[in-house]
Amino acid sequence: LENEAYFIKTNQKEVKIPLNFSICKVNDISSPKNTIIFVDEDKLQFPLTIRKRNEGDYFYPSGMKGKKKLSKYFKDEKMSLIEKENTWLLCSKNKIVWVIGKRADQQFVANKTTQNIIKLELL
């Protein structure tokens, strides 16, 4: 597994490498998709990190109960080895915020009471 990592600073508006996505503050939440998530800014610790998977990674997939090992999630999603190797993770400290293009971690997902919402969109 490669150890390359990229960082996102506070108030950064877009990311070009390794993936192209936009970051913006919004006032409300529309329907999330695989390519769009809405997160609670107050739960994030900057700089955020974009990295590949590590042994033992786990997250709390949105829409599911409890935590799941990333390896088990990949298996359940029937992802090929190439797909797994090409999947990037958006992390806050060491916690996965988003399996980019797949699923967000419910601990970070914005809800009706969230004050500061950030929309992340894969372009």
Where are these regions (language model features)?
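AMP-forming adenylation/ATP pyrophosphatase catalytic core
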Residues: L1-L123
